[in-house]
């Protein structure tokens, strides 16, 4: 499973092999993922195809600020939308996800397997993936659609009165509960045209297999994109890690708990920007990292940080191949007989990295609204 949370953080990082003491300012790409969950060959192939969407979506968000993003959360939402779409709209969604050569049933089964995989035997790692549809009590969703999203995505449909503020409160309460309070709300209000909100929530909490010693955390320089320097708490340890170095970047993997999940950090080489690095990175190369990494002693410095991001994804998803879901040409006839479209797709995400481990959460919401002709 790729990209539970992705972050681009500006920092003065140090990822050096053996006794090399060179420290340099640059920016890092971080990926929380799992390599050891069990899927069928078909499910694994479908999930791997979706990893291309994950990397491409993250690339649309690279700018001059630190970002945290969960492409997996967006993928679950898009999967539910694919089941409600028809015609060209459905084709666009599947192509954007990189699974246009896969049946919708196969896609659903892959997401079902991902949901089932969250029940691990690792007592040091918690992961929760949840889906939900909040619908106005006057809006009708087709029964077959409701049956599919419940059976394949565990997405219950909750009927609410969208004309009252209690509907907003209920939606935000669900978000807070599913993310253990990390994302307390996703929306402030509902418009008169809104008829439903499709939501995915992801929560991750993991303890490092090798925690950082708090006594080793020191205040050190932190350099951002604008080259300004500020002082931050920098964690430090020297230990055996899976490590790789090439002409573009260095990479190190930090496992959690019993190694089911891990964080991989990519640090551009001196003189290489994160934008230049990401141009050279695709899903296939990220996948090959784990095959090419070797165990060695790594002198690692990593900022102790908390960062959060709120982003509207309409433009990004449109550019990646699914513009029709956001305009009057949207076809969601497998979801409802009403003329509806996604007026807004937004995500809130947050990550906390400390000496003990990592907490990360994301909510992705698709606002379904009536098309006024």
Task: Annotate the PLM regions.
Residues 10-21, 139, 189, 254, ...:
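Soluble, non-membrane globular domain cores that form compact, hydrophobic packing
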Residues 89-93, 273-275, 309-311:
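Extracytoplasmic/secreted cell-surface and envelope-processing proteins
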Residues 93-97, 212-221, 275-284:
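Short Gly/aromatic-enriched secondary-structure transition segments
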Residues 40, 70, 99-106, 236, ...:
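General structural signal for secondary-structure boundaries
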Residues 64, 104-269, 291-368:
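Non-catalytic, conformational "gating/processing" segments within enzyme and secreted inhibitor domains
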Residues 371-373:
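Conserved small/polar residues in nucleotide/adenosyl-binding loops
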Residues 2-162:
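Detector for small/aliphatic-rich hydrophobic stretches
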